[in-house]
């Protein structure tokens, strides 16, 4: 055997699919005898003020109470918010960083978001960049998973598609935010956050000057060059500034996930 990849030895990649429809399913549903007693690990906690690339983001410290519980208190927020986390999961005898199997988010006991990775559709792949803070990944190389359902996505693994992860925080009210994270072997971690509602803590960013509207075609024309964006090229509004520099066009920054490329 020869290993031609970046790992330390020969290995096998495989996937399992349902015969009807060729839908990929979670291989952990089968008796693979993989030892796993390790809980998901949480690195950072974030609140967002909206669902698109212009929403404000704020990071809050977490304190690890014990092996399974993280907490944070004294957080103030207002309006509609949703959650982001930097996290990973590992199995015994492996240092590979995996994603989690399922997540549930509740505010004062009411569930606002829930997903479970039993299967995944090939159609889900075009929405995958909506599950992360794409701008954060491109500018700071940090992968933050976002726990909300973007209006443009239609993930097959969402448990209740009527729960989009947005929670309304009202001034003068107190809230308990409880997040449950699980791997397939039922190793769980919990995040317990206490919030107080005030006015305008997470403000929506100001309107941009070079907005591309998703419902319109946009073309930037110069003397001998042009750039054309077909409508629905992006999942939401994008602030794209195009510069003509001699024989080169500089087309904005890669901080907006594209629907069509």
Where do the language-model regions lie?
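Proteolytic processing hotspots in large secreted/extracellular or virion-associated proteins
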Residues: 202-205, 241-261
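Short, solvent-exposed loop/turn segments at the edges of extracellular beta-sandwich modules
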Residues: 3, 92, 182-187
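Short beta-strand elements
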Residues: 174-176, 184-211
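Compositionally biased low-complexity segments at domain edges in trafficked proteins
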Residues: 39-64, 204-237
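Extracellular recognition modules
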Residues: 15, 178-182
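Acidic, glycine-rich catalytic/binding loops that coordinate metals and/or anionic ligands
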Residues: 15-89, 94-95, 124-133, 172-173
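Exoplasmic/lumenal beta-rich domain surfaces
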Residues: 64-71, 99, 105-168
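Flexible, gly/ser-rich surface segments that form the specificity/activation loops bordering the active-site cleft
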Residues: 1-11
């Amino acid at each position: 055997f020869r290993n031609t990849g970046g790992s330390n030895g020969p290995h096998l990649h495989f996937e399992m699919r349902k015969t009807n429809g060729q839908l990929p399913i979670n291989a952990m549903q089968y008796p693979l005898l993989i030892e796993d007693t390790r809980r998901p690990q949480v690195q950072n906690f974030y609140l967002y003020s909206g669902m698109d690339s212009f929403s404000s983001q704020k990071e809050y410290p977490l304190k690890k109470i014990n092996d399974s519980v993280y907490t944070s208190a004294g957080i103030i927020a207002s309006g509609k918010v949703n959650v982001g986390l930097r996290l990973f999961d590992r199995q015994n005898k492996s240092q590979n960083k995996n994603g989690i199997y399922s997540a549930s988010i509740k505010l004062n006991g009411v569930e606002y978001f829930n997903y479970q990775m039993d299967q995944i559709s090939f159609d889900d792949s075009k929405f995958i960049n909506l599950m992360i803070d794409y701008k954060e990944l491109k500018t700071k190389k940090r992968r933050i998973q976002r726990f909300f359902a973007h209006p443009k996505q239609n993930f097959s693994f969402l448990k209740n598609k009527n729960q989009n992860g947005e929670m309304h925080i009202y001034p003068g009210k107190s809230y308990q935010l409880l997040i449950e994270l699980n791997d397939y072997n039922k190793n769980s971690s919990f995040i317990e956050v206490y919030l107080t509602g005030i006015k305008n803590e997470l403000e929506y960013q100001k309107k941009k000057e070079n907005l591309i509207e998703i419902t319109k075609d946009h073309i930037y024309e110069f003397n001998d060059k042009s750039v054309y964006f077909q409508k629905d090229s992006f999942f939401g509004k994008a602030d794209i500034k195009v510069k003509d520099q001699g024989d080169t066009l500089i087309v904005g920054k890669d901080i907006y996930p594209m629907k069509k490329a």
